Protein backbone atom coordinates (compact mmCIF):
# COMPACT_ATOMS: atom_id res chain seq x y z
CA UNK A 1 0.00 0.00 0.00
CA UNK A 2 1.12 3.57 -0.72
CA UNK A 3 2.31 5.25 2.47
CA UNK A 4 0.23 8.20 3.61
CA UNK A 5 0.86 11.21 5.85
CA UNK A 6 -1.79 12.93 7.94
CA UNK A 7 -1.82 16.07 10.06
CA UNK A 8 -3.57 16.10 13.43
CA UNK A 9 -4.82 19.52 14.51
CA UNK A 10 -4.29 20.29 18.24
CA UNK A 11 -7.94 20.83 19.06
CA UNK A 12 -7.50 21.10 22.82
CA UNK A 13 -4.65 23.52 22.22
CA UNK A 14 -7.34 26.17 21.78
CA UNK A 15 -7.67 25.97 25.58
CA UNK A 16 -4.03 26.75 26.42
CA UNK A 17 -2.82 29.35 23.94
CA UNK A 18 -1.42 27.12 21.19
CA UNK A 19 -3.79 28.56 18.58
CA UNK A 20 -7.31 29.96 18.30
CA UNK A 21 -10.25 28.05 16.87
CA UNK A 22 -10.27 30.21 13.75
CA UNK A 23 -6.53 29.60 13.33
CA UNK A 24 -7.15 25.87 13.63
CA UNK A 25 -9.66 25.99 10.76
CA UNK A 26 -7.32 28.19 8.72
CA UNK A 27 -4.54 25.64 9.28
CA UNK A 28 -6.82 22.95 7.90
CA UNK A 29 -7.31 25.03 4.75
CA UNK A 30 -3.57 25.64 4.48
CA UNK A 31 -2.74 21.93 4.93
CA UNK A 32 -5.16 21.03 2.15
CA UNK A 33 -3.68 23.67 -0.15
CA UNK A 34 -0.11 22.36 0.31
CA UNK A 35 -1.05 19.05 -1.28
CA UNK A 36 1.41 17.34 1.09
CA UNK A 37 -1.08 15.74 3.47
CA UNK A 38 -3.41 12.88 2.64
CA UNK A 39 -5.62 13.43 5.67
CA UNK A 40 -6.55 15.96 8.32
CA UNK A 41 -7.43 14.64 11.79
CA UNK A 42 -9.14 16.02 14.87
CA UNK A 43 -10.00 14.37 18.18
CA UNK A 44 -13.28 13.96 20.03
CA UNK A 45 -14.61 13.91 23.56
CA UNK A 46 -17.59 15.53 25.22
CA UNK A 47 -17.09 15.75 28.97
CA UNK A 48 -14.07 13.55 29.69
CA UNK A 49 -11.56 15.66 27.75
CA UNK A 50 -13.47 18.78 26.62
CA UNK A 51 -12.60 20.42 23.29
CA UNK A 52 -14.41 22.16 20.41
CA UNK A 53 -17.12 19.68 19.41
CA UNK A 54 -15.98 17.49 16.54
CA UNK A 55 -19.13 17.25 14.38
CA UNK A 56 -19.52 21.04 14.33
CA UNK A 57 -15.82 21.54 13.65
CA UNK A 58 -15.91 19.10 10.73
CA UNK A 59 -18.58 21.26 9.10
CA UNK A 60 -16.12 24.16 9.01
CA UNK A 61 -13.24 21.98 7.83
CA UNK A 62 -15.36 20.47 5.05
CA UNK A 63 -16.14 23.99 3.82
CA UNK A 64 -12.49 25.12 3.61
CA UNK A 65 -10.87 21.96 2.17
CA UNK A 66 -11.20 20.15 -1.14
CA UNK A 67 -8.92 17.13 -1.26
CA UNK A 68 -7.75 15.84 2.12
CA UNK A 69 -9.60 13.05 3.90
CA UNK A 70 -11.28 14.43 7.03
CA UNK A 71 -10.83 12.00 9.90
CA UNK A 72 -11.52 11.74 13.60
CA UNK A 73 -9.17 9.80 15.80
CA UNK A 74 -10.84 8.70 17.75
CA UNK A 75 -14.57 9.37 18.15
CA UNK A 76 -14.36 8.74 21.90
CA UNK A 77 -17.96 9.84 22.47
CA UNK A 78 -19.30 7.32 19.95
CA UNK A 79 -20.61 4.90 22.62
CA UNK A 80 -22.63 7.66 24.31
CA UNK A 81 -24.03 9.28 21.15
CA UNK A 82 -27.42 8.47 19.68
CA UNK A 83 -26.59 6.26 16.67
CA UNK A 84 -29.51 7.45 14.51
CA UNK A 85 -28.63 11.12 14.98
CA UNK A 86 -24.94 10.34 14.49
CA UNK A 87 -25.62 8.44 11.25
CA UNK A 88 -27.47 11.45 9.86
CA UNK A 89 -24.80 13.92 11.01
CA UNK A 90 -21.97 11.87 9.49
CA UNK A 91 -23.88 11.33 6.24
CA UNK A 92 -24.40 15.09 5.98
CA UNK A 93 -20.69 15.69 6.56
CA UNK A 94 -19.88 13.15 3.86
CA UNK A 95 -22.14 15.09 1.51
CA UNK A 96 -20.54 18.43 2.47
CA UNK A 97 -17.05 17.02 1.93
CA UNK A 98 -17.92 15.18 -1.31
CA UNK A 99 -17.13 11.80 0.22
CA UNK A 100 -14.01 12.55 2.28
CA UNK A 101 -15.04 11.48 5.80
CA UNK A 102 -13.24 8.78 7.79
CA UNK A 103 -14.54 7.65 11.17
CA UNK A 104 -12.27 6.01 13.75
CA UNK A 105 -14.33 4.82 16.71
CA UNK A 106 -13.12 3.71 20.12
CA UNK A 107 -14.48 2.79 23.52
CA UNK A 108 -13.63 6.22 24.93
CA UNK A 109 -12.32 4.80 28.20
CA UNK A 110 -9.58 7.21 29.26
CA UNK A 111 -7.25 7.90 32.17
CA UNK A 112 -7.92 8.89 34.84
CA UNK A 113 -10.69 6.33 34.80
CA UNK A 114 -13.22 8.59 36.49
CA UNK A 115 -13.04 10.93 33.46
CA UNK A 116 -14.83 8.54 31.09
CA UNK A 117 -17.22 7.52 33.87
CA UNK A 118 -18.02 11.21 34.37
CA UNK A 119 -18.74 11.57 30.65
CA UNK A 120 -20.93 8.49 30.52
CA UNK A 121 -22.97 9.20 33.64
CA UNK A 122 -25.34 11.84 32.16
CA UNK A 123 -26.13 9.41 29.32
CA UNK A 124 -26.49 6.33 31.51
CA UNK A 125 -23.43 4.72 29.90
CA UNK A 126 -21.03 2.77 32.11
CA UNK A 127 -17.41 2.11 31.21
CA UNK A 128 -18.20 -1.61 31.30
CA UNK A 129 -20.73 -1.20 28.48
CA UNK A 130 -18.65 1.02 26.19
CA UNK A 131 -17.05 -1.71 24.04
CA UNK A 132 -20.39 -3.40 23.39
CA UNK A 133 -22.07 -0.05 22.67
CA UNK A 134 -19.28 0.85 20.25
CA UNK A 135 -19.77 -2.40 18.35
CA UNK A 136 -23.56 -2.05 18.33
CA UNK A 137 -23.47 1.58 17.19
CA UNK A 138 -21.03 0.66 14.41
CA UNK A 139 -23.46 -1.95 13.13
CA UNK A 140 -26.36 0.50 13.35
CA UNK A 141 -24.74 3.40 11.50
CA UNK A 142 -23.49 1.16 8.70
CA UNK A 143 -26.98 -0.21 8.16
CA UNK A 144 -28.53 3.25 8.25
CA UNK A 145 -26.01 4.48 5.66
CA UNK A 146 -26.78 1.67 3.22
CA UNK A 147 -30.34 0.43 3.86
CA UNK A 148 -33.87 1.80 4.00
CA UNK A 149 -36.59 1.12 6.57
CA UNK A 150 -34.09 -0.31 9.03
CA UNK A 151 -35.45 -2.18 12.04
CA UNK A 152 -33.00 -2.93 14.82
CA UNK A 153 -33.35 -4.79 18.11
CA UNK A 154 -30.10 -4.46 20.01
CA UNK A 155 -28.91 -4.68 23.56
CA UNK A 156 -28.89 -0.90 23.96
CA UNK A 157 -30.82 0.52 21.02
CA UNK A 158 -34.02 -0.61 19.33
CA UNK A 159 -36.11 1.04 16.62
CA UNK A 160 -38.37 0.23 13.67
CA UNK A 161 -38.48 1.36 10.04
CA UNK A 162 -35.88 4.13 10.14
CA UNK A 163 -34.43 5.62 6.95
CA UNK A 164 -31.63 8.17 7.14
CA UNK A 165 -31.41 10.80 4.41
CA UNK A 166 -29.34 12.18 2.82
CA UNK A 167 -27.26 9.16 2.03
CA UNK A 168 -23.50 9.56 2.44
CA UNK A 169 -21.48 9.83 -0.77
CA UNK A 170 -19.41 6.84 0.32
CA UNK A 171 -21.45 3.69 0.67
CA UNK A 172 -20.66 3.39 3.48
CA UNK A 173 -18.00 5.73 4.87
CA UNK A 174 -15.02 3.79 6.27
CA UNK A 175 -15.00 2.98 9.97
CA UNK A 176 -11.68 2.28 11.71
CA UNK A 177 -11.31 1.10 15.29
CA UNK A 178 -8.74 2.88 17.44
CA UNK A 179 -7.14 0.83 20.19
CA UNK A 180 -3.93 0.80 22.21
CA UNK A 181 -2.09 -1.77 24.34
CA UNK A 182 -4.20 -3.29 27.10
CA UNK A 183 -3.56 -6.27 29.40
CA UNK A 184 -4.75 -9.75 28.51
CA UNK A 185 -7.36 -11.11 28.07
CA UNK A 186 -8.70 -7.75 26.84
CA UNK A 187 -5.89 -7.34 24.30
CA UNK A 188 -6.80 -10.38 22.21
CA UNK A 189 -10.47 -9.47 22.33
CA UNK A 190 -9.72 -5.90 21.22
CA UNK A 191 -7.48 -7.01 18.35
CA UNK A 192 -10.04 -9.53 17.15
CA UNK A 193 -12.70 -6.81 17.24
CA UNK A 194 -10.55 -4.72 14.88
CA UNK A 195 -10.38 -7.60 12.41
CA UNK A 196 -14.08 -8.44 12.55
CA UNK A 197 -15.66 -4.98 12.68
CA UNK A 198 -13.28 -2.38 11.27
CA UNK A 199 -12.18 -1.12 7.88
CA UNK A 200 -8.80 -0.18 9.39
CA UNK A 201 -6.86 0.05 12.65
CA UNK A 202 -5.72 3.25 14.35
CA UNK A 203 -3.21 3.06 17.16
CA UNK A 204 -0.41 4.84 19.01
CA UNK A 205 3.06 3.52 19.79
CA UNK A 206 3.36 3.42 23.57
CA UNK A 207 6.20 0.87 23.47
CA UNK A 208 8.81 0.10 20.79
CA UNK A 209 7.29 -3.27 19.95
CA UNK A 210 3.62 -2.23 19.92
CA UNK A 211 3.05 -2.51 16.17
CA UNK A 212 5.33 -5.48 15.58
CA UNK A 213 3.62 -7.50 18.34
CA UNK A 214 -0.02 -6.58 17.75
CA UNK A 215 -0.26 -6.19 13.98
CA UNK A 216 0.58 -9.87 13.23
CA UNK A 217 -2.26 -10.90 15.54
CA UNK A 218 -4.71 -8.64 13.70
CA UNK A 219 -3.53 -10.06 10.38
CA UNK A 220 -4.14 -13.61 11.61
CA UNK A 221 -7.66 -12.67 12.65
CA UNK A 222 -8.23 -10.98 9.28
CA UNK A 223 -7.28 -14.19 7.48
CA UNK A 224 -9.71 -16.11 9.71
CA UNK A 225 -12.41 -13.64 8.63
CA UNK A 226 -11.57 -14.19 4.96
CA UNK A 227 -10.17 -10.68 4.62
CA UNK A 228 -6.95 -9.60 2.91
CA UNK A 229 -4.44 -8.37 5.52
CA UNK A 230 -2.28 -6.76 2.82
CA UNK A 231 -4.98 -4.21 1.98
CA UNK A 232 -5.97 -3.43 5.59
CA UNK A 233 -5.05 0.18 6.53
CA UNK A 234 -3.04 0.82 9.69
CA UNK A 235 -2.90 4.42 10.90
CA UNK A 236 -0.28 5.33 13.51
CA UNK A 237 -1.05 8.49 15.48
CA UNK A 238 2.28 10.06 16.48
CA UNK A 239 3.61 13.26 18.02
CA UNK A 240 6.63 15.29 16.97
CA UNK A 241 8.73 18.13 18.31
CA UNK A 242 11.52 19.60 16.18
CA UNK A 243 14.52 21.12 17.95
CA UNK A 244 18.32 20.88 17.73
CA UNK A 245 18.39 19.64 21.35
CA UNK A 246 16.52 16.33 21.37
CA UNK A 247 16.12 16.24 25.14
CA UNK A 248 14.71 19.78 25.20
CA UNK A 249 12.22 18.76 22.50
CA UNK A 250 11.18 15.76 24.57
CA UNK A 251 10.75 17.86 27.73
CA UNK A 252 8.50 20.34 25.92
CA UNK A 253 6.43 17.48 24.51
CA UNK A 254 6.03 16.00 27.98
CA UNK A 255 4.76 19.35 29.31
CA UNK A 256 2.52 19.83 26.26
CA UNK A 257 0.87 16.42 26.65
CA UNK A 258 0.43 17.11 30.36
CA UNK A 259 -1.52 20.26 29.48
CA UNK A 260 -3.41 18.46 26.74
CA UNK A 261 -4.51 15.36 28.65
CA UNK A 262 -3.52 15.90 32.26
CA UNK A 263 -0.85 13.87 34.09
CA UNK A 264 -1.81 10.51 32.59
CA UNK A 265 1.22 9.62 30.44
CA UNK A 266 4.51 8.46 31.90
CA UNK A 267 7.76 9.92 30.65
CA UNK A 268 8.58 6.57 29.07
CA UNK A 269 5.27 6.40 27.18
CA UNK A 270 5.71 9.99 26.01
CA UNK A 271 9.16 9.16 24.68
CA UNK A 272 7.85 6.20 22.66
CA UNK A 273 4.91 8.27 21.34
CA UNK A 274 6.91 11.30 20.22
CA UNK A 275 9.49 11.85 17.49
CA UNK A 276 11.92 14.49 18.75
CA UNK A 277 15.08 16.23 17.62
CA UNK A 278 16.38 17.38 14.27
CA UNK A 279 14.46 16.86 11.02
CA UNK A 280 16.73 13.89 10.29
CA UNK A 281 16.01 12.30 13.68
CA UNK A 282 12.27 12.94 13.47
CA UNK A 283 12.05 11.55 9.93
CA UNK A 284 13.97 8.43 10.98
CA UNK A 285 11.55 7.81 13.85
CA UNK A 286 8.56 8.17 11.53
CA UNK A 287 10.20 5.86 8.99
CA UNK A 288 10.36 3.21 11.71
CA UNK A 289 6.57 3.35 12.09
CA UNK A 290 6.19 2.58 8.39
CA UNK A 291 8.76 -0.21 8.70
CA UNK A 292 6.78 -1.68 11.60
CA UNK A 293 3.64 -1.89 9.45
CA UNK A 294 1.87 1.47 9.49
CA UNK A 295 0.38 2.46 6.14
CA UNK A 296 -0.31 6.00 7.36
CA UNK A 297 1.27 8.15 10.04
CA UNK A 298 -0.74 11.12 11.26
CA UNK A 299 1.36 13.73 13.02
CA UNK A 300 0.61 16.17 15.82
CA UNK A 301 3.08 18.86 16.84
CA UNK A 302 3.55 18.94 20.62
CA UNK A 303 5.00 22.43 20.95
CA UNK A 304 3.79 25.91 21.82
CA UNK A 305 5.91 27.10 18.88
CA UNK A 306 3.41 25.29 16.68
CA UNK A 307 3.48 27.44 13.57
CA UNK A 308 7.26 27.46 13.17
CA UNK A 309 7.42 23.71 13.70
CA UNK A 310 4.64 23.18 11.16
CA UNK A 311 6.76 25.06 8.64
CA UNK A 312 9.76 22.85 9.50
CA UNK A 313 7.62 19.74 9.14
CA UNK A 314 6.59 20.73 5.63
CA UNK A 315 9.99 21.95 4.47
CA UNK A 316 12.41 19.58 6.19
CA UNK A 317 10.65 16.41 7.36
CA UNK A 318 8.05 15.50 4.73
CA UNK A 319 10.58 15.75 1.86
CA UNK A 320 12.63 13.11 3.69
CA UNK A 321 9.57 10.86 3.90
CA UNK A 322 8.56 11.47 0.29
CA UNK A 323 11.80 11.88 -1.65
CA UNK A 324 11.33 13.14 -5.20
Protein language model regions, located:
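Active-site mouth loops of central-metabolism enzymes
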Residues: 7-22, 74-83, 172-188, 268-280
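N-terminal beta1-alpha1-beta2 module of alpha/beta enzyme domains
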Residues: 1-69, 128, 172-174
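Hydrophobic faces of well-ordered beta-strands that scaffold small-molecule active sites
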Residues: 3-9, 38-42, 70-73, 101-105, ...
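Alpha-helix-loop-beta-strand connector modules within alpha/beta enzyme cores
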Residues: 52-72, 133-137, 314-324
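Acidic (Asp/Glu)-rich catalytic clusters
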Residues: 29-34, 58-67, 90-101, 192-196, ...
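Glycine-rich, proline-tolerant flexible connector loops at the mouths of alpha/beta enzymes
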Residues: 39-64, 76-77, 205-209, 300-312
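Conserved, mostly hydrophobic/aromatic
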Residues: 61, 93, 141, 175, ...
